[in-house]
UniProtKB/Swiss-Prot annotation:
The lineage of its organism: Bacteria, Pseudomonadati, Pseudomonadota, Gammaproteobacteria, Thiotrichales. This is Erythronate-4-phosphate dehydrogenase. The keyword Cell division does not apply. The active site is at 211, 236, 253 (proton donor). Pfam families: 2-Hacid_dh, 2-Hacid_dh_C, DUF3410. NAD(+) binds at residues 150, 178, 231, 256. It comes from Hydrogenovibrio crunogenus (strain DSM 25203 / XCL-2).
Length: 375
């Protein structure tokens, strides 16, 4: 018989009760409100990014497992967990596809709006990990010239496919996808510093859908660019109003918030906890998942970029997120910022979308390369 256990779970973790209830008693609480008292009888703690997991929270509790359903790690004191034999699992890569789709969707939208062709542009990816690799794959499918900057990978792989940061900053479009670190040889805090941003030219496009603080925001404000796409902010939920006003697209750290990314994070932590307690996973929770979106039908224009834009507009529209935060004045209202993130509208990732095959085999192959199902 399975011993009685208690799990305290951030109530923003999707499908928490459906996934975890067979493992024990599930207590769902707002992540920012979880405190030591709530954990007195808890065996496991499952969080997103709003709970600071450290000695102040866990000391004098019986928590033996901490799971984070998001990829960021700066809310978890990992040395403390290790020193106290508390197992930690983070759902690394769970939202990588969602973030890559956010970046590519915005680039396609910009190309249509500003009347340029993506296949004629160069894209530098700063940080080629879970997200960067998927951005690379999608950008190459669209015919872009892709340049890669990732010093740790360059050293480890001894590969000449990577370039240094100064050369990467010469690209038409620059997107950052590193973790946020403040120490070590490859620290990324203010990686794009005042000196680096002085190299940026007015025709370039700059994107941050990684972590706030990788780009020095005060320097960014004084950097003339063609366009800025910003999802991550240095002091969020305090959004820099000057930078916000310079952004073509400004969103409240939701690039990784596609429903499928959240589900993946929940499931990854669930399976890790099952392994920790040596319990067989139960897949019956899947019956609660929503059905796939309706099929997408398309009338081709003959221009692949325009046709891809028409498909993507039926999947997710970042301009609607931008309009929502501007209409609600989220830039100066912390509660609205958090509310929008917690009540984020559902959208699905491209692999969940079915597109009816078109008469153009080349375009069908492009859709397949981007991850769509063809029917």
């Amino acid at each position: 018989m399975t011993p009685s256990r208690t799990l305290v779970i951030d109530d923003a973790v999707p499908y928490a009760k459906e996934l975890f209830s067979h493992l024990g008693n599930v207590i769902s609480l707002p992540g920012k409100e979880i405190n030591t008292e709530h954990l007195q009888n808890a065996d496991a703690l499952i969080v997103r990014s709003r709970t600071q997991v450290n000695s102040a929270l866990l000391e004098h509790t019986n928590v033996s497992f901490v799971g984070s359903t998001v990829v960021g790690l700066d809310h978890v004191d990992q040395p403390y967990l290790k020193e106290n034999a508390i197992e930690f699992y983070s759902a690394q890569g769970c939202n990588a596809n969602s973030v890559s789709e956010y970046v590519i969707t915005n680039l396609v939208n910009l190309a249509i709006e500003k009347k340029f062709t993506l296949s004629e542009k160069s894209l530098a990816i700063i940080g080629v990990g879970h997200v960067g690799k998927l951005v690379e794959k999608k950008a190459r499918a669209l015919g872009m010239t892709v340049l890669l900057n990732d010093p740790p990978r360059a050293r480890q792989e001894m590969s000449d496919e990577f370039i240094d940061l100064d050369n990467a900053l010469k690209s038409d479009i620059i997107t950052v996808h590193t973790p946020l670190t403040k120490t070590g040889q490859d620290a990324t805090f203010h990686l794009l510093s005042t000196d680096k941003l002085k190299k940026i030219q007015p025709h370039q496009i700059l994107i941050n859908a990684a972590r706030g603080g990788i780009i020095d925001e005060q320097a960014w404000i004084n950097t003339p660019t063609e366009s800025n796409i910003i999802d991550c902010w240095e002091n969020e939920p305090n959004i820099n109003p000057d930078l916000y006003n310079q952004a073509d697209i400004a969103t409240p750290h939701i690039a990784g918030h596609a429903l499928d990314a959240k589900i993946a994070g929940s499931e990854m932590v669930y399976r890790a906890l099952c392994q920790h307690w040596q319990i067989s996973p139960d897949d019956s929770w899947r019956r609660f998942l929503p059905p796939p979106p309706p099929p997408i039908s398309l009338s081709l224009t003959g221009n692949h970029q325009e046709d891809i834009h028409n498909v993507l507009q039926q999947c997710y529209r970042p301009e609607e997120d931008d309009a929502a935060i501007r209409a609600n004045n989220i830039v100066v209202t912390h509660k609205k910022y958090e509310y929008y993130r917690r009540h984020y509208p559902i959208h699905r990732e491209w692999p969940q979308h079915r597109v009816i095959k078109t008469p153009d085999p080349t375009f069908n192959n492009l859709l397949y390369s981007l991850g769509f199902q063809l029917i």
